[in-house]
C-alpha cells in the first residue's frame, strides 16, 4: 500500500491497545493524516503514557510532517527552512555531519536536533516489538461510506487541544521600539489613493511597499508572478505575496514632537496626574501648552520641582534667572518628569508616609501608591505613556471604497491619520525654517489634539468632526458599545448555513421533528448534497454542481438522504433562556413556512400569528452529536428555572382533553328547560350499563348507545392492570372519554379518574368502585361526578409521568396528548357566537343601587361632612365592590355547557375578568398619570360602549403598550448584566468538602402568609448535617445526602420549621461551585454534572420572566402614605444593583432593648440600649410608622420602621448570611407576587457573585494596599503566602457590590472590557500588565477558544480525564 494512501486510513487499523486508540479519537485523530494538525509537544501531552506506543507509527510514517510541528525553537526552524528542509522526511535523510555544517557548529541548536534524532531513532521500531509494517494488511470494505465511518467514531466527549492555542492573554504598554518592530515601514505623507490611477500613493496611508500588494502576487509593475513568491520587486519595491497581508501589516508615523496618550491623561482617574502627583487640570494645561512645569528648579531660585507656571510667569522668570532653571511645556515636560521618576524610591517613600498620615491624606497616598506599584511590579516604563511614534493599523482594517462618479467612501480613521500627518509634516517644516516659538508651540498643541482624536475622539474637549454634528469614529469607538468590536464581532457573530421563515403549526409532527421547506433545505444542505452526489453517483465535482443546479431527481433523493439523522437548530428571537434554541430532526415539507410542533411553542414563547424563526445547521459530527444528545426538543421537557414541565398543552389541546374527560350524570337538572332535560336523558339513557371490555364500550359509542361522557361500569382489569387487589374484585365507574385518555398514559401508571394529586401518585380512589352484588343504579347516586381535566391538571400529569418514566416515555405521551386534544376539540365542535354571551340579569338594579349610594355620598360632601379625598375614596370603593359582586354573580349564572365558559374553565383561553367585561361592566379606568378615574365604564362589550366610555378606555390601552415596550428593554438589559456577572460560574468539582451550610425556612410576607414553602427550598438540595425528626428522632437524611421528593415531604410533615442545607453561599471551590452545594440540575432532574454552566442558567432564569414583572412603583395609602414601595422590575434592579432603596427602613445597629419612643415635632425618636448599656438614637421621618414598641428586645439588623432595608447597611451591622438571605427573600417575594416560580439556587448564584470581594482594612505583611477591594481568592492567596513566612495576616471585611460594579471588577479584564467602560478597563489593565487567565466563558468566546464548560472543561488544567482500561469506549455504543 502506497504511503499517501495509507495516510487517509483510520487509526482503527493500527495495532494499538484500546486505551491508545480511545485517546487518539478523543483528541480528534481519526485518520493518520490528522497527526499533522498537532505539534509534537501537544501529542505528548494528549497521549501521555500512550505516546511511546504510538511513537513507532510516527517514526515509520515521518509524522508530524512539517518541521514547524516538531516543537523546535523558531531559530532552528528558520535555519532548516533556509537550507530547504521543510518536512521531517527531508530532515531524516541528512546525516549528523551535514547538519553540523548547516548549523555552523552552534552547540545549543545542535542539541535540539540531536534530541529529536534520539526520539525518532529507527531502532525503536524493532525494540518496541512492533512489526515494521505498522498497519494490518486489511483493506476497508468498499461499501462502507465515508459518512458511516465518520458516524461510527462520533465523539460525544472530545479533548480539542488544537482550538485553544494559548493559556492566558496579557496586555501592556508598548515601547517605541516595539511599535517600530511591528511596522513594515514609515508613513510619511497623508496621500491615500491616486484618483486617476486608483492605485495607492507611495509613502501614503495605503502604500503597497509598506502594507503589501493590493492584488495577490502582483506588484505595481503589472504581471502576476507566483514564481517570485516572497521576493521584493527591484523596480517598485513591493513584496510579491498574497494581498491578505494588508489585513495584518502595520506601519508607523515618527512624530516630530512627543505626545501624551489621551487614555492615561483624560480617563478618569487620570493615571498620569496620580503618578506625578499633580492635579489633572494643571497637567492638562501643561500638555496642551497653556502652562509650563518646572523640571529642574536650579540653584538660588524660588522655584520647586513640578511647580506650574503660567506663560506670563515663565517669561518674567526667564528674564530674571535666565538659564539657571528649566521649565518645559507640552508632552516633552511630562516625558522628562516620568523619566526622572525613581519608582523604588517612590514606593518606599509613600509606604513610610502611609503609616503617619491622616485619613484624608491616606486616601490620596493609597491612590498614588496603587499606580506607582502597578508600574513598579510590571514590565512597563512610565515614559511609554508619552509617544514619539504611533502605529498605523493595516489598511484593510480601514478601507477606502470607490463610489460612482470617481469619489471614495472612507473610514473615519483615515481622516484622523491624515490630520496627524498634515500637522506632523507642517511641524517638521516649521522646525527646518526655524519658525518662532509661538507658532511651533501651537502646531505641537494641534498635533497633540490630532493624536488624541485618533485614540479617543469621544472624550471631553474639542472633537474632530466631519460635519458640525458628527464626530469621527476613533480607535476607542471601534471597541466600545454595542456596535464595537467586542460586542458586535467577538461575542456574537453572524453564521453561514442558516435560514429564516415564518412558522406555522405542525400538528402531525413528532416531538423531536420540525418541518423544513424543501427549497430552504436544498440550499442549507448544499455541501452535504454535493458530497452525496459524488459518493453515490460517482459524479465529478463539476457534474455534481450541474446536477445540483438542475435540481433533478437525484438531487432531491440526495437531500432526503442527507437530512436523515441530521438535526437542525431552531431559534426564535429574543432568546431569553437556553430553551430559545432547540434541536429538531428535519421532516421535508412543501410550501415556504417552517412547521413547528405545537407543544414546544411555550419554550420559545412563540405563537403562529406571523412569528419568524431562524434555522441553523450544525456541521461537524461533534456539533451534530451535541445537538442530538443535549438539545433535542424531546429532551428539553423541564424548565431550568423551576424544574416544572415547560411543554404544557395549550388552547385546542387543553380544550379537547377537557371535553373528552367531562363526566355527566343522567339526573342532571336543567330547571324549566324540559326540552334540554329530555335530550340529556336520551343521550345518557344507558348510564350505569355493564361492559366487559373496552372494545365493547367503543362499539356502544359507535352505535350511539352511549356518549363520551356517559357514566358506565366496567371490569377494572379490562382497562388497566394498576388497580389494587380489592379494586380488581369490584366494578369501576368511569366514562369512555376517560378510558380513551388513560390509553395514552404508560402501562404502569395509575388509572386517572379524577383530577387530584392522590389519584396520580397513589391509586384510583375507592369511591369510584361498586362492590359486586350491589344495585348499580342506587350506587351511582352516591358516586360523585368528578371535574373534567383542566390545563393545570394536565401539567401535573406530565410532571408525574416525567418523574416515574423519564424523558423518552414522557415525550411519547406528550405527542399522544397533543393528538388526543386536537382530535376531540374537533369532535366537540366547540364554537363561540354572539348568542353565547348574555348580559348579566341583575346588573341594571345593582348599578342603579350604587348610583343612589354615590348621590348620598356627594350630599355628605356638599354638607362638609367629608373631605374631597375621602369622598373620592368612598366613590371608588363603591364602584369596585359592585364590579366584584357582578363578577361573582356572572360565574354562578353561567351554564357549564356554555362554550365560552368551557374555554375559560378548561384553561384554554380567557379568564373571569374577560367575562366581567364581556357581559358585566368594564369598571373603573386609570388616567395617563395612573390615577383611577371616578366615573366607571358601566357598559359591557356585549352592550357596547358610549363615546365618553370609549375615550376613557383608551388611556389604559396606550399606557399598556408603552409600558410593554419600556419593560422589554429594561428586562433585556437586566438579563445582560446578570449574565455578565455570573458567566464564569461553572460546576468545577463534585464536592468542595465544605462543612458549613445555611438554615432555610419558608419565606413569608408581612402578614405571615407563606410565599415560598419550605419544601420548595429544600427539594433537590444536599443536607449540611444529619436531619433528624424533632418528634421521633428518626434520621430523615444523612449529611451530604440528597433531599428527594419523599424526604422533603416527610421533613415538612414532621413540622420542622428550619433545615440546614448545603448552599452555594458557603461553597469553598475556587473558580466555580461544587455539585453538592448546587444540588440537582432542574432541567434534567438529575445530579448536576461537572462542567455545567450554572451561572448563565441562573442569569437566564431570573432575566427571562423579567418581562412579566410590572414597571410600577406603588403608592401606598393609610399610615405609611409617604413611603413609595417599589415593586416589580424596578425592585429587582434595586436589589441586584445593591442600591439605596426608595422608602428606606431604619435598622438597629446593635442587639439590645427599646428604651424609649418619643415624638418631637412630628418625627419619631427611638432610643435603644445595647447589652453594655450604651444608648443609640434613631430618628424616623414624620410619616413613617415605627415597627417596635417600648421595652421590646431587638437584634442587630432588625427593622425599626416600615420600608425596605439597604442590604449594604445590613451587611455592615450583621453578617454575609443575613444580608444574602434578605436579598434572596426579597427577590422571591417580587417574583412570587407575579406568580413566577424561580428556584433559590439561581438567585444564590447571583448573590454569591455580588459578595466575591473584600475591602482590606489592615494590610499586615501582604502586598495588598489598605482600603482596596480584592477578590476573596486573591485575599486568601496573599494570606497563605504570608502564613508560610509566619508574617502578619491581612484583615478585611466583605463588601456587597451591585451586579454592574461586580462585572466591572471581574478578575478577567477581557470580560469586564466587553461589558461596559471599555477604555477605562483596558487603560488600567495595560498599566498593570494584567494577565487574563481565561477562566470564564466570555473571555474564551472572545479569543475564539473552546469555552470551559461541558466537554470543553476536560481540557482545563485542573481536570484529569482518564478512561478505564476495561470499559468499552463511549462511541462504540453511540447510535
Curated annotation (Swiss-Prot):
Catalytic activity: RNA(n) + a ribonucleoside 5'-triphosphate = RNA(n+1) + diphosphate
Region annotation DNA-directed RNA polymerase subunit beta': where it falls in the sequence: 159-1353
Any GO BP annotation: DNA-templated transcription
Molecular function GO labels: DNA binding; DNA-directed RNA polymerase activity; magnesium ion binding; zinc ion binding
Pfam families listed in its UniProt record: RNA_pol_Rpb1_1, RNA_pol_Rpb1_2, RNA_pol_Rpb1_3, RNA_pol_Rpb1_4, RNA_pol_Rpb1_5
Annotated binding of Mg(2+), by residue: 607, 609, 611
Essential cofactor(s): Mg(2+); Zn(2+)
InterPro entries membership: DNA-dir_RpoC_beta_prime, DNA-dir_RpoC_beta_prime_bact, RNA_pol_asu, RNA_pol_N, RNA_pol_Rpb1_1, RNA_pol_Rpb1_3, RNA_pol_Rpb1_3_sf, RNA_pol_Rpb1_4
Alphabetically ordered keywords of this record: DNA-directed RNA polymerase, Magnesium, Metal-binding, Nucleotidyltransferase, Transcription, Transferase, Zinc
Function: DNA-dependent RNA polymerase catalyzes the transcription of DNA into RNA using the four ribonucleoside triphosphates as substrates.
SUBUNIT field: The RNAP catalytic core consists of 2 alpha, 1 beta, 1 beta' and 1 omega subunit. When a sigma factor is associated with the core the holoenzyme is formed, which can initiate transcription.
HAMAP family from the UniProt entry: RNApol_bact_RpoC
Protein name, UniProt field: DNA-directed RNA polymerase subunit beta'
Organism from which the protein derives: Acholeplasma laidlawii (strain PG-8A)
Originating gene: rpoC
Amino acid at each position: 500500500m502506497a504511503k499517501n494512501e495509507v495516510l487517509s486510513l483510520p487509526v482503527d487499523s493500527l495495532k494499538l491497545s484500546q486505551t491508545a486508540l480511545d485517546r487518539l479519537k478523543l483528541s480528534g485523530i481519526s485518520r493518520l493524516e490528522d497527526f499533522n494538525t498537532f505539534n509534537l509537544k501537544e501529542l505528548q501531552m494528549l497521549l501521555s503514557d500512550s505516546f511511546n506506543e504510538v511513537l513507532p507509527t510516527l517514526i515509520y510514517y515521518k509524522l508530524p510532517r512539517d518541521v514547524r510541528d516538531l516543537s523546535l525553537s523558531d531559530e532552528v526552524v528558520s535555519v532548516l527552512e533556509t537550507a530547504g528542509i521543510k518536512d521531517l522526511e527531508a530532515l531524516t535523510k541528512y546525516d549528523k555531519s551535514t547538519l553540523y555544517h548547516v548549523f555552523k557548529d552552534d552547540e545549543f541548536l545542535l542539541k535540539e536536533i540531536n534530541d529529536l534524532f534520539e526520539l525518532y531513532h529507527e531502532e525503536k521500531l524493532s525494540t518496541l516489538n512492533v512489526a515494521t509494517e505498522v498497519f494490518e494488511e486489511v483493506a476497508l470494505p468498499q461499501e462502507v461510506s465515508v459518512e458511516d465511518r465518520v458516524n461510527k467514531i462520533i465523539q460525544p466527549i472530545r479533548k480539542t487541544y488544537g482550538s485553544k492555542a494559548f493559556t492566558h492573554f496579557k496586555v501592556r504598554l508598548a515601547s517605541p521600539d516595539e511599535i517600530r518592530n511591528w511596522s513594515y515601514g514609515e508613513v510619511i505623507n497623508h496621500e491615500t489613493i491616486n484618483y486617476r490611477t486608483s492605485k495607492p500613493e507611495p509613502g501614503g496611508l495605503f502604500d503597497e511597499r509598506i502594507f503589501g500588494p493590493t492584488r495577490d502576487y502582483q506588484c505595481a509593475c503589472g504581471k502576476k508572478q507566483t514564481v517570485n513568491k516572497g521576493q521584493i520587486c527591484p523596480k517598485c519595491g513591493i513584496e510579491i505575496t498574497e494581498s491578505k497581508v494588508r489585513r495584518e501589516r502595520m506601519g508607523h508615523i515618527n512624530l516630530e514632537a512627543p505626545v501624551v496618550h489621551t487614555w492615561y491623561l483624560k480617563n478618569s482617574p487620570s493615571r498620569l496626574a496620580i503618578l506625578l502627583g499633580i492635579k489633572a487640570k494643571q497637567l492638562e494645561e501643561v500638555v496642551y501648552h497653556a502652562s509650563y512645569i518646572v523640571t529642574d528648579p536650579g540653584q538660588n531660585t524660588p522655584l520647586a520641582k513640578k511647580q506650574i507656571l503660567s506663560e506670563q510667569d515663565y517669561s518674567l522668570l526667564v528674564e530674571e534667572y535666565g538659564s539657571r532653571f528649566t521649565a518645559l511645556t507640552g508632552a516633552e515636560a511630562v516625558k522628562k518628569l516620568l523619566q526622572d521618576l525613581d519608582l523604588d524610591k517612590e514606593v518606599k517613600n509613600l509606604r513610610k508616609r502611609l503609616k503617619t498620615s491622616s485619613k484624608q491624606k491616606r486616601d490620596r497616598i493609597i491612590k498614588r501608591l496603587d499606580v506607582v506599584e502597578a508600574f513598579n511590579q510590571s514590565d512597563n516604563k512610565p515614559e511609554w505613556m508619552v509617544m514619539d511614534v504611533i502605529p498605523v493599523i493595516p489598511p484593510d482594517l480601514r478601507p477606502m471604497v470607490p463610489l460612482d462618479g470617481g469619489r471614495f467612501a472612507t473610514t473615519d480613521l483615515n481622516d484622523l491619520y491624515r490630520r496627524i500627518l498634515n500637522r506632523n509634516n507642517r511641524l517638521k517644516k516649521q522646525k527646518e525654517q526655524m519658525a518662532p516659538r509661538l507658532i511651533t508651540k501651537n502646531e505641537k498643541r494641534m498635533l497633540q489634539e490630532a493624536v488624541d482624536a485618533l485614540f479617543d475622539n469621544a472624550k471631553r474637549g474639542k472633537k474632530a468632526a466631519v460635519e458640525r454634528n458628527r464626530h469621527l469614529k476613533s480607535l476607542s469607538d471601534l471597541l466600545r458599545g454595542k456596535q464595537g468590536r467586542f460586542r458586535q464581532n467577538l461575542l456574537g457573530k453572524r453564521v453561514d448555513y442558516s435560514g429564516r421563515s415564518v412558522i406555522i403549526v405542525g400538528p402531525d409532527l413528532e416531538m423531536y421533528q420540525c418541518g423544513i421547506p424543501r427549497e430552504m433545505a436544498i440550499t442549507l444542505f448544499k455541501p452535504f448534497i454535493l458530497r452525496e452526489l459524488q459518493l453515490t453517483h460517482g459524479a465529478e465535482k463539476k457534474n455534481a454542481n450541474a446536477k445540483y443546479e438542475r435540481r433533478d431527481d437525484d438531487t432531491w433523493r440526495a437531500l432526503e438522504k442527507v437530512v436523515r439523522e441530521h438535526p437542525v437548530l431552531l431559534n426564535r428571537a429574543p432568546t431569553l433562556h437556553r430553551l430559545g434554541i432547540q434541536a429538531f430532526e428535519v421532516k421535508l415539507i412543501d410550501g415556504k413556512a417552517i412547521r413547528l410542533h405545537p407543544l414546544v411553542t411555550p419554550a420559545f414563547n412563540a405563537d403562529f400569528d406571523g412569528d419568524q424563526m431562524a434555522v441553523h445547521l450544525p456541521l461537524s459530527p461533534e456539533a451534530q452529536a451535541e445537538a442530538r444528545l443535549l438539545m433535542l426538543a424531546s429532551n428539553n421537557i423541564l424548565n431550568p428555572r423551576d424544574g416544572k414541565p415547560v411543554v404544557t398543552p395549550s388552547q385546542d389541546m387543553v380544550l379537547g382533553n377537557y371535553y373528552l374527560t367531562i363526566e355527566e350524570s343522567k339526573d342532571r337538572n336543567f330547571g324549566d328547560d324540559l326540552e334540554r332535560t329530555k335530550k340529556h336523558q336520551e343521550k345518557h339513557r344507558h348510564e350505569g350499563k355493564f361492559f366487559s371490555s373496552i372494545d365493547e364500550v367503543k362499539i356502544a359509542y359507535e352505535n350511539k348507545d352511549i356518549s363520551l361522557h356517559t357514566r358506565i361500569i366496567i371490569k377494572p382489569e379490562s382497562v388497566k392492570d394498576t388497580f389494587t387487589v380489592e379494586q380488581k374484585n369490584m366494578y369501576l365507574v368511569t366514562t369512555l372519554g376517560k378510558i380513551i385518555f388513560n390509553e395514552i398514559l404508560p402501562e404502569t401508571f395509575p388509572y386517572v379518574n379524577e383530577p387530584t394529586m392522590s389519584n396520580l401518585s397513589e391509586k384510583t380512589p375507592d369511591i369510584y368502585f361498586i362492590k359486586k352484588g350491589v344495585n348499580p343504579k342506587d350506587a351511582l347516586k352516591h358516586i360523585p361526578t368528578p371535574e373534567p381535566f383542566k390545563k393545570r391538571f394536565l401539567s401535573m400529569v406530565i410532571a408525574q409521568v416525567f418523574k416515574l418514566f423519564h424523558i423518552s416515555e414522557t415525550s411519547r405521551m406528550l405527542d399522544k396528548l397533543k393528538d388526543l386534544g386536537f382530535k376531540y376539540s374537533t369532535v366537540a365542535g366547540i364554537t363561540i357566537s354572539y348568542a353565547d354571551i348574555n348580559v348579566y340579569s341583575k346588573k341594571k338594579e345593582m348599578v342603579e343601587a350604587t348610583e343612589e349610594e354615590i348621590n348620598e355620598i356627594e350630599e355628605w360632601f356638599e354638607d362638609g361632612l367629608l373631605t374631597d379625598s375621602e369622598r373620592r375614596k368612598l366613590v371608588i370603593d363603591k364602584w369596585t365592590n359592585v364590579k366584584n359582586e357582578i363578577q361573582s354573580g356572572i360565574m354562578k349564572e353561567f351554564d357549564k355547557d356554555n362554550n365560552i365558559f368551557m374555554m375559560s374553565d378548561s384553561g384554554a383561553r380567557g379568564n373571569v375578568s374577560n367575562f366581567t367585561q364581556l357581559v358585566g361592566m368594564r369598571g373603573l379606568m386609570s388616567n395617563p398619570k395612573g390615577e383611577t378615574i371616578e366615573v366607571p365604564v358601566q357598559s359591557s362589550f356585549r352592550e357596547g360602549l358610549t363615546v365618553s366610555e370609549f375615550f376613557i378606555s383608551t388611556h389604559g390601552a396606550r399606557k399598556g403598550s408603552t409600558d410593554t415596550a419600556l419593560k422589554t428593554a429594561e428586562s433585556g438589559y437586566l438579563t445582560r448584566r446578570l449574565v455578565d456577572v455570573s458567566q464564569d460560574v461553572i460546576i468545577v468539582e463534585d464536592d468542595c468538602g465544605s462543612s458549613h451550610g445555611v438554615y432555610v425556612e419558608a419565606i413569608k410576607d408581612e402578614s405571615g402568609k407563606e410565599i415560598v414553602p419550605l419544601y420548595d427550598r429544600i427539594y433537590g438540595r444536599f443536607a449540611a448535617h444529619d436531619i433528624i425528626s424533632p418528634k421521633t428522632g428518626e434520621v430523615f437524611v444523612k449529611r451530604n445526602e440528597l433531599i428527594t421528593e419523599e424526604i422533603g415531604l416527610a421533613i415538612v410533615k414532621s413540622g420542622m420549621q428550619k433545615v440546614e442545607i448545603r448552599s452555594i453561599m458557603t461553597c469553598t471551590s475556587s473558580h466555580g461551585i461544587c455539585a453538592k452545594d448546587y444540588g440537582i440540575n432542574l432541567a434534567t432532574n438529575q445530579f448536576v454534572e461537572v462542567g455545567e454552566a450554572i451561572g448563565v442558567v441562573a442569569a437566564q432564569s431570573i432575566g427571562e420572566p423579567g418581562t412579566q414583572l410590572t414597571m410600577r412603583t406603588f403608592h401606598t395609602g393609610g399610615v405609611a402614605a409617604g413611603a413609595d414601595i417599589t415593586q416589580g422590575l424596578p425592585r429587582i434592579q434595586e436589589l441586584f444593583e445593591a442600591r439605596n432603596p426608595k422608602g428606606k427602613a431604619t435598622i438597629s445597629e446593635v442587639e439590645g432593648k427599646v428604651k424609649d419612643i418619643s415624638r418631637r415635632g412630628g418625627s419619631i425618636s427611638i432610643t435603644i440600649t445595647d447589652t453594655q448599656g450604651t444608648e443609640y438614637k434613631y430618628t424616623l421621618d414624620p410619616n413613617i410608622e415605627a415597627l417596635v414598641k417600648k421595652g421590646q428586645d431587638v437584634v442587630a439588623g432588625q427593622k425599626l420602621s416600615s420600608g425596605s432595608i439597604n442590604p449594604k447597611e445590613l451587611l455592615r451591622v450583621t453578617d454575609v448570611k443575613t444580608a444574602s438571605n434578605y436579598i434572596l427573600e426579597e427577590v422571591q417575594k417580587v417574583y412570587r407576587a407575579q406568580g413566577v416560580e424561580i428556584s433559590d439556587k439561581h438567585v444564590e448564584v447571583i448573590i454569591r457573585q455580588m459578595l466575591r470581594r473584600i475591602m482590606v482594612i489592615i494590610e499586615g505583611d501582604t502586598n495588598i494596599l489598605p482600603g482596596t477591594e480584592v477578590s476573596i481568592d486573591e485575599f486568601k492567596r496573599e494570606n497563605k503566602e504570608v502564613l508560610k513566612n509566619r508574617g502578619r495576616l491581612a484583615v478585611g471585611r466583605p463588601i456587597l457590590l451591585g451586579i454592574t460594579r461586580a462585572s466591572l471588577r471581574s478578575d478577567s479584564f477581557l470580560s469586564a472590557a466587553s461589558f461596559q467602560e471599555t477604555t477605562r478597563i483596558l487603560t488600567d489593565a495595560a498599566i498593570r500588565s494584567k494577565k487574563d487567565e481565561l477562566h470564564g466563558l466570555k473571555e474564551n468566546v472572545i479569543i475564539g477558544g473552546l469555552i470551559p464548560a461541558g466537554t470543553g472543561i476536560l481540557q482545563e488544567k485542573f481536570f484529569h480525564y482518564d478512561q478505564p482500561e476495561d470499559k468499552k469506549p463511549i462511541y462504540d455504543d453511540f447510535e
